[in-house]
Swiss-Prot record:
It comes from the Bacteria. GO terms for molecular function: small ribosomal subunit rRNA binding; structural constituent of ribosome. It comes from Ruegeria sp. (strain TM1040). Residues 1-22 are annotated as: Disordered. Keywords: Ribonucleoprotein, Ribosomal protein, RNA-binding, rRNA-binding. This is Small ribosomal subunit protein bS20. One of its GO terms (cellular component) is small ribosomal subunit. Pfam families: Ribosomal_S20p. InterPro entries: Ribosomal_bS20, Ribosomal_bS20_sf.
Length: 87
């Protein structure tokens, strides 16, 4: 348990940031799930549109510190390859 005032404040800040980051991660995962579902259905147009919507969301997560840049790039790259393979 935090004893000093500074430690108590940091604990409060951590809880607040955890909740914010959790919401951001959830939002990004929703966008990624839409791409996955479009790929699974075999609809290339829907998958392309979903990927276009997911890319800026993922990169926004990088800017906000939710994801590492390489992680987001890897996710986008793999999804793009799968969408391209739908042909």
């Amino acid at each position: 348990m935090a004893n000093s005032p500074q430690a108590k404040k940091r604990a409060r800040q951590n809880e607040k940031r955890f909740a914010i980051n959790k919401a951001r991660r959830s939002r990004i995962r929703t966008f990624l799930r839409k791409v996955e579902e479009a790929i699974a259905s075999g609809d290339k147009e829907a998958a392309t549109a979903a990927l276009r919507a997911a890319q800026p969301e993922l990169m926004r997560g990088v800017t906000r510190g939710v994801y590492h840049k390489n992680t987001a790039s890897r996710k986008i790259s793999r999804l793009a390859a799968r969408v391209k393979a739908l042909g």
